[in-house]
Amino acid sequence: MSALPFSTICRHSNTPLHLHSKSSFIGFDQRNNIWQLFVITKSSSSRAVSKLSVKNVASDKKEELKEPLTGQVAGTTNEFVPDSTAIASSIKYHAEFTTSFSPEKFDPSKAFFATAESVRDFLIINWNATYDYYERINVKHAYYMSMEYLQGRALLNAVGNLELSGPYAEALRKLGYSLEDMGNQEPDAALGNGGLGRLASCFLDSLATLNYPAWGYGLRYKYGLFKQLITNDGQEEVAEDWLEMGNPWEIQRKDVSYPVRFYGEVISGPDGSKQWIGGENISAVAYDVPIPGYKTRTTVNLRLWSTKVSTEEFDLQAFNTGDHAKAYAAMKNAEKICYVLYPGDESIEGKTLRLKQQYTLCSASLQDIIARFEKRSGRTVNWETLPDKVVVQMNDTHPTLCIPELIRILIDVKGLSWEKAWDITKRSVAYTNHTVLPEALEKWSLTLLQDLLPRHVEIIRKIDEEFIHEIISEYGTGDLNLLQEKLGKMRILENIELPDSVVELLNNTIPAVDSVEEIDVDDSDIEATNKKDEDEEDEAGEEEQEEDNDGEDLVLENKIEMTFKVDRKLPMMVRMANLCVVGGFSVNGVAEIHSEIVKEEVFNEFYELWPEKFQNKTNGVTPRRWIRFCNPDLSKIITKWIGTEDWVTDLEKLAILRKFADNEDLQLEWMESKRRNKIKVASFIKEKTGYVVSPNAMFDVQVKRIHEYKRQLLNIMGIVYRYKKMKELSAEERKQVFVPRVCIFGGKAFATYVQAKRIVKFITDVGATVNHDPEIGDLLKVVFVPDYNVSVAEMLIPGSELSQHISTAGMEASGTSNMKFAMNGCVQIGTLDGANVEIREEVGEDNFFLFGARAQEIAGLRKERAEGKFVPDPRFEEVKSYVRSGVFGTYNYDDLIGSLEGNEGYGRADYFLVGKDFPSYLECQEEVDKAYRVQKKWTRMSILNTAGSYKFSSDRTIHEYARDIWRIEPVVLP
């Protein structure tokens, strides 16, 4: 049995280190007094008895290895795991030879990197095995393309998925550390921001666990979004240098890079072919991150691109003459593409940088996909089979340029015709919509795109032109107003003249005379008229007849121009979401209510044209990270009462808990587990904020991106009302009326989103006042946890008792934090929006606190507001006045509170209906207090939330994508 083709000479322990029998084997051996790291794999299936052999670097002889503890030949048992001594040996080896730390001491940072690199050895072996096998059988792959991946820490997740938590914990104890301490040393990977990136990471975990052949593609951001600091001025942003000490999980592929071009010009060849030349050229370099599945050898790949230019671009002459900025201008210009996630786009420079990011992701990834497709195809490449081997899933509109880029590669590089390239592309690309917010349905300036990507604009214009003809074919030219309405909503290009071919078509098909009026006349009149006409025709001749025809054409052209006129005052735009729908074979929403809104409102015209394209795929989250690993206490209870740990990969088994919801023993265990988690949260809050909170209070949590539609403002306004009412009561009355609460917020506001940053400032000001009020004490605390990320979520969610998902109905596509909270037995208060609708159905209406207007009412309510018919609740007016009184400090909140007032105008008129839903929200919170006072009832609700959360596993979601969109099958390694 041959070894993997790499070995490392080292000095260390002679204890063999081996993997689970379904995986591989690593160890150390001594030949001629030289220590050697060897790697062993098994060719037989895990069910068969097998022997392991090791390749000796010096002699290439194969020798059987014996287990050091049992004396048996390695591999003669079906199941084995590495022991702690072997793992400790591996960690010490990496501490000495791999890490970039001083050799004098074995400090926590060094210990973490050595531990991570030890784990990475296992991942690389499984990664190699996975993709060697996929290459051999040439299986169809799903390629998930996303601008962000919010991975969180990888160490505990990796050792958990590999079933090595116990051995690693014991090994680290021998070395003077704990596995938990090592996990806390790891920084979160700053590759994402919110639900979009976290969903992508959950999907990769499920793809690996379920053995689906897939890759993820993204960008390797040097500084992420930003690190959030909370000061007296609110939120401040600083660069998050998560790569400062390196990333032990990534493998730089120096041999995998692709050219990416910007600007330049397009020239035509004598045969009509197009060539994009000149401009600015950079290279995208691959960094691979192996993603392990749970209890499986399958390890999928996340390939991240970093950008650079060749050293030839360094202007040494300029540097030596003192013009240092000019010397490395090209290098910095390339590198900055991957500096920051979502750079500010208020300026033209910011917009250009974002487009460069999006195109870099698309171009490098597609070149990589096609290169691998060609390699697997052998000498003869049949491009018609590309959709049978490749499916690209665009995670929102950021990767939209995949569509014109794939066409460009197929036509300009591979020599295919337009017809073939367009057909292949339409069968290879799928689109997931994540938002109904107009500002998030990306539009880009045609002028900017033309400057940056001239060849792609040609392709987009061609797609738009063909699509217009398809619309005309569908709706005809009989009603120009209807046609104009359809084109106005469906065209890819906005506020741009019709193509010449379309104008010509309309000229040839629209009748010049719209109607003919019938009148009664005598026969004698007809004869006289005919005679007169004949005489006039003889005199006028052909010249006058031509003038009449020209006049008719001019009238028709004017009519077309007036009907399909463009507004020169408005910019010409490219609608990326429309391009996704036109260029992809599938469009899916991410929750049932969201998918209905997509079909009925956002893309209704497209749905009428192509109903077969549209479907729903309700989001999910991985139960490995979000229950099994982040809440081990609860996981043990679930396993005990269900009777098996199979629920980790078959979440439907959680439903078994329903029959035990009233069991007093389970309820007691459940409450004790929750309290232990709350104590951890209280300690964490003190560490991060300095505030001391009581674990006896209800932990009420809203953690998510700060945005007006997510309505953190509604939450904090409700807290202000609660605080004001407390101040009006005596100490005894307060205790009787109010349940003690710790109100926890977390989330980042985009650096340029002024109103969201005002909300953060408001929350922190309220907290500073309430938390230092001796009259209130532990009855109410308000905490904003800074720099919210995956690791913070893993701490807060297990200890949460009430979670708030209170977006304006119809504006949240799905949400995934609501699913994580439900899995961990957290009762929810929310609107009928996004996945809330389905969560409420699954956990039971009695176990979900519902309030607020419904999605179908929102448009009418906004209209009423604009007409001045809305009458605010007196309690809402009371809170606004209280805020303006200065009780929470000297900050001027007029702009924030003013957004909730008036009937019209930008930034006014309470667009997100905080005032409308405020009374319903307060009444619902009263019901929450009542339920929490009866702990037995509350615990029952908590258990039923966990039991009803099984639908929201990303495993279920991925199975549906694989079956209905990607058409791929699981591939289990032999």
Predicted regions located by residue number:
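A conserved ligand/cofactor-binding region detector
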Residues: 2-16, 20, 29, 35-974
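Intrinsic disorder/low-complexity segments in short proteins, especially the signal peptide
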Residues: 22-24
